[in-house]
Amino acid sequence: DIKLFDRGFDFYAPQTFEDENGRRILIGWMGIPDADYTNPTEEAGWQHALTIPRELSVRDGKLIQEPIEELKQLRSEDKAVCTFCYGQTIIMQNAIYEAVVDFKRCREMVMTLREGITLSYKDNILTLNLGVYGSGRSTRKVRLEKLEHLQIFADTSSLEIFVNHGEEVLQQESTIIMEDY
């Protein structure tokens, strides 16, 4: 079977290297150079970005991509946002955040990652929906055996979503610039 490294919209030209501890690290370009959409960052004088560095490994015959441990050193404080209940919608309140969500027997959920952008799970399908902000690129879907864990990194111009401890990854360079609210 062929497996995509990243199920998101803008993953391009990944490069890997081995660090001094023997870890295989991947960094990709977050942006497609010949795409027919534009990003508001162009008005600010820049276009595209690099993904979060990902440590590559193999677990149970599957390629795993997890954010490097060093990112934990950048955290400033923990905030408990909510307890997730069946049928509840989670709405993230900031433009810049790292969210870690663990699920027990999740059958269905919806998260609003930012205004107009949702992540949903139903019938074993995880869907990232950009809505009107996708510039014609509206959804990405991935079939999962089950949803147990999400780790989401968001800043004012991108989202990176690590599913089930790196079994799947989705990223998106934003077609909108979010103000921290």
Regions found by a protein language model. Give the residues of each.
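Active-site neighborhood of glycoside hydrolase catalytic domains
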Residues: 1
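Beta-rich accessory regions
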Residues: 5-181
